[in-house]
Amino acid sequence: MRYLRGEEAVTVRPEYAGTPIYVLAGFRSAMVAAKMGLGVILGGPVATQEAAARVYREHALADAPPIISSLNIAVADTPAVARDLLLPEAYAKVLAQSTGEFGALRPAGELDMDALTGQQRRRIEEALAHDVWGTVREVGEELRGVGKRLGVSEFVVTGDMPDVAGRARSEELLASLQAEN
């Protein structure tokens, strides 16, 4: 209370040691981050992250912060619902490759999948194959496997979802995974 009244200072314990800086990196940037003594958050497909993690560890300083993985992740009560949460972003990215414009994300039910070319549909499926989505059990198993492959214990969840209620449910289910660990 004395601090709140301005009568006394507070000693922070442990002492502030600085905020680590992380680089959101793919393969090449991981090596640069390692050589500069910076932490790394790996992005992209898991196979690319695996190679980047290996290079980072080969070149990192001994006291480098742990590697973090960034993945598009969606959890739902069924795999189909989880997939639909990530579909809008994959759809928009694929259309952007054809049109040059990244439009606003629309919920999966509003997407015109029939208007896509065969190549566009394949690209969407390829994009979703690099994402992590499914039920709590499925996502938990996949994240444990990815964690072992990459040697990471932390994930940054990415993936924009226009379905606000679905995103909230996904985050709730993801939090239940955290509680299990």
Predicted regions and their residues:
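Active-site-proximal loop/turn and secondary-structure-junction residues that shape catalytic pockets
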Residues: V46, I73-V75, M161
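An alpha-helical appendage that flanks or caps ligand/catalytic pockets
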Residues: M1-T11, A53-L150
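Internal, glycine-rich beta/alpha segment that forms the wall or movable "lid"
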Residues: M1-L38, T48-E50
